[in-house]
Amino acid sequence: MPATFGIVDLFSGPGGLGEGFASLDLSGHAPFKIGISVEKEASAHRTLTLRAFLRAHQARHGTLPQAFIDFHAGLIPEPGWSEVDAAAWRHATAEAQCLELGTEPAAAAIDHAIGALRRDFDDTILIGGPPCQAYSLVGRARAKGKVGYVPEEDERHYLFRDYIRVLDRLRPAAFVMENVKGMLSSTVESRLVFEMLMEDLASLGTGQGHHYEMRAIRVADSRASLQEAAQPSDFIVRAEEFGVPQRRHRVIIVGIRSDLADRATGTSIPVSGVARAVDDAIGTMPDENGGGKFVHGSGGLVLLRAA
């Protein structure tokens, strides 16, 4: 039977990275299940919880709840989701935690989740990316304009260590860490933050078992694969190389536990590689002010326009 991996998602935001993992379907098998996601910002956490609810409902019933479709079509006000599907809502509120990493409540919740993940899944994966404001070029420019700002006193520079503490506790099969490109040039204590991060990652497993081998996602000949990085910039992933109509560049580090690293060697997946314009992706979406409503059709949701 194919392996199933339990996911720990840190600094989750509204859950985009976790949604990508959870949505993967391999011939009817979903290899990734989110065990816990952690986000401290309230509005992002609301979206995170709703997405967890929708996944749980769809797993139980095979479709999205009609109330969700009607709500987004403007036909009804937002319902109480616990009344729509109480079991799915309980699952969602247990999965999506509104907590701040580095605090005792967060540590207790993550430790509890780790125990369940080890019991219920073949192995685990850690995903997430520390908040980027301290590393982004815009964030750094704003910080310079603040009177009395001292980078060494900005805790956001060191949030990656909360990620590493969980990584050390979980010891997953693999991890994925994402951040803005500015992380490569951001400095604190007269050192590059990226250099500090890589040193901390490399120290895991020293003298106590398996370490992690860091890999970069590289695209060549319309195929993506995990490769050793010769330089920090190799970790930059360019969205347009994957057919995304956006020039969004992000640093993504993939770490593979050393006892599994050989399995990733020589493996690749096809990618689009075709440049797409925004109109290619959303040109068929309905006009926001065009009226009409959504109904179920043979190919999914269909917009019925008013005459």
Cite the ranges covered by each PLM segment:
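Class I S-adenosyl-L-methionine
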Residues: 116-120, 133, 137-307
